[in-house]
Amino acid sequence: MEKISRVWFDSRRVYIETDASKVYSRPLEAFPVLLEATEEDRLDYKIGRFGDDIRWPSLDEDIHITSFMEETAEPDYANDIAMIFSRFPQLNVSEVARSIGINKSLLSKYIYGIKKPSEKRKQEIVSSLHKLGRELIAI
């Protein structure tokens, strides 16, 4: 297996170069912790001893080389969940995720269109937001 030799970022993507001189990249939306991190925190990484992973100790984030090599979705900002959060930017992703019992990172991937929620999960998200709306009306 190839080994990671270099890591860098631009405004929307994270890149790796391997010892085989191949370059791979993924959108930062695939890694919400890195997307929200400062440039300084993004640059504070260590390539693992075997060259197959990257660790950001200050962010408690790890990414394996296979995350760059898999056929995975690019961001799709035109999805239903993204449109809801775009229309209501005051929504707190962490709190909405907590209210439906999922990880913030997973909800972020739904918002960015990196992962697609099942119809059941989409309904759970919408129902949670409807509940919030009813609570706001009751004030």
Where do the PLM segments sit?
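Motif-centric detector for short Cys/His coordination patterns
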Residues: 1-139
